[in-house]
């Protein structure tokens, strides 16, 4: 096959990582993660990273890339991922990209929007406003000036809410106006796990309780003890931002679990809608991919 990569996307808790792992074994290739939270070290349970055992079976890239307090964005991801894709292809293999961070996948396929340079001074001011008035205050502002992008990222994505406001203040243009869709810059076979919302909801509830059993609370405590504070982007990941108030005595464990489930369901719903709008082929199991690959050959 003359392609640059195979992409397996989909909502959280939809089984895409398991499918990608089995396909990687079948094709004797390597996996590139497209998950914005798996890049952070020491955050294993809450991000549902592949186990160390699986990472011994198959080479995984873009996992444990930076410390939780280090800056990481879509631009950095694309630069690193494209370099890895090239390295894997030079080995005569087809890389498999798997993840649910659709902004990463979109940027890989269509390139990065030509926006203004980062304005760190303005960014600090916006972060200060978020801390004083709440993130919802900034999100409502973003909805007024760029409803399209606001609905795409959701109300809890602090980093992207602030960046979008920063761009609008400096350019007078909404962030969504910068990203013009062109032909893909890579030739890929794209798939996405197409579970029903009801199936996703059941999986999310089951996985949340599994994370609690596996020690999510202890993982959060360790992060705080290492000095990785709540305000950091990494600590805004679903699972961590809900557990920290419980650890600090500001909420009950029941409330933390309920909030994790609610926020995960909302995020999964946005992911599901995004992937359904793509030209990717819907799948449910690895057999669906095998059948598709066979149909291309025969």
UniProtKB/Swiss-Prot annotation:
The record marks 101, 123 as: Interaction with substrate tRNA. Keywords: ATP-binding, Magnesium, Nucleotide-binding, Transferase, tRNA processing. GO terms for biological process: tRNA modification. The keyword Lipoprotein does not apply. It is an enzyme of class 2 (transferase). Residues 35-38 are annotated as: Interaction with substrate tRNA. Its cofactor is Mg(2+). ATP binds at residues 10-17. It catalyses: adenosine(37) in tRNA + dimethylallyl diphosphate = N(6)-dimethylallyladenosine(37) in tRNA + diphosphate. Catalyzes the transfer of a dimethylallyl group onto the adenine at position 37 in tRNAs that read codons beginning with uridine, leading to the formation of N6-(dimethylallyl)adenosine (i(6)A). PANTHER family: TRNA DIMETHYLALLYLTRANSFERASE. Belongs to the IPP transferase family. This is tRNA dimethylallyltransferase. It comes from Hydrogenobaculum sp. (strain Y04AAS1).
